[in-house]
Design a protein with these regions (language model features):
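Active-site beta->alpha loop and helix N-cap motifs at the rims of alpha/beta catalytic domains
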Residues: 2-3, 14-133, 143-147
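Short boundary motifs at domain starts and secondary-structure transition points
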Residues: 7-13
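Short N-terminal or domain-adjacent regulatory/targeting segments
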Residues: 1-5, 238-241
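Catalytic alpha/beta core domains of metabolic enzymes, predominantly
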Residues: 102, 112, 117-252
Length: 252
């Protein structure tokens, strides 16, 4: 598995890096959580901007991003607007999504930006190039809350993300049986062993898939999302449990 380093955090090497989400409606609540997470064991904080009531207000977005950067110090900041189509809290047009991503990049506050693979469509390479020009790494994501596609399809999707220039392809899928979890893990191994251009982030959701959030070092997922009190997706494991298990399963 390959690796990338951001703010001295090496993603894709050793223990999977842990991300905790901020899912709050107001700027005050968002910054309060950021201050609390700044001293947590997490490596990265994801701001789920789709929860923020004023996310599409340029001034409010800029102010909140500056506050987050100040509160988090050297801890990584991943900014995500999860669309309703992929399980998020708010809907937005393609132009609004493009403007949001551009504003996040221009702010100079984000280390990582989540760009949805299907929402960006043909514009994905352009959006990724814009992020890179601003020094922002891109998590290119795809979520399926209904099923787990076959392994070949999962691998092909992550390869297309790599080809578009993504720094961290991310897949989250829902299992309907135990073999679905194995399909996701097998796709992860294939990417980590044979397609080394980037690290990848993968997870099988829900209670059945929770094990996939804990075995990334063995199977090749570079980051995992933990629940710090409020989950942002089904199957997220509490942060203290994630830390304990990841330490117990370390390969070196």
């Amino acid at each position: 598995m390959s690796s990338i380093t951001i703010r001295r955090c090496c993603i894709g090497e050793g223990r999977p890096k842990v991300i905790v989400p901020i899912v709050e409606r107001t700027e005050a609540a968002i910054l309060q959580k950021a201050a609390a997470f700044s001293t947590s064991s997490a490596d990265c904080v994801e701001w789920r901007a789709d929860w923020f009531a004023d996310a599409l207000d340029a001034d409010a977005l800029s102010r909140c991003l500056r506050g987050l950067r100040a509160a988090l110090g050297e801890k990584l900041l991943l900014v995500t607007f999860r669309t309703q189509a992929e399980g998020g809290e708010a809907a937005l047009t393609a132009d609004q999504y493009a403007a949001f991503c551009a504003a996040v990049c221009a702010s100079g506050c984000a280390d990582l930006l989540d760009i949805e693979f299907f929402s960006a469509g043909e514009r994905l390479p352009q959006w990724i190039a814009t992020a890179h020009a601003a020094g922002v790494k891109v998590v290119c994501s795809s979520h399926d809350f209904q099923k787990t596609p076959p392994r070949a399809e999962l691998v092909e999707r992550m390869l297309r993300m790599q080809q578009a220039g993504a720094d961290l392809p991310k897949l989250a899928v829902m299992p309907t049986c135990r073999t679905d979890v194995l399909e996701l893990l097998a796709a992860t191994v294939e990417m980590a062993d044979h397609h080394l251009e980037t690290p990848v982030i993968t997870m099988s959701m829900g209670a059945l898939g929770a094990v996939s959030r804990l075995c990334g070092e063995a199977f090749g997922s570079a980051m995992t999302f933990a629940n710090p009190g409020t989950a942002s997706a089904p199957g997220q494991v509490p942060l203290d449990v994630v830390d304990t298990v990841l330490d117990s399963l370390r390969l070196s």
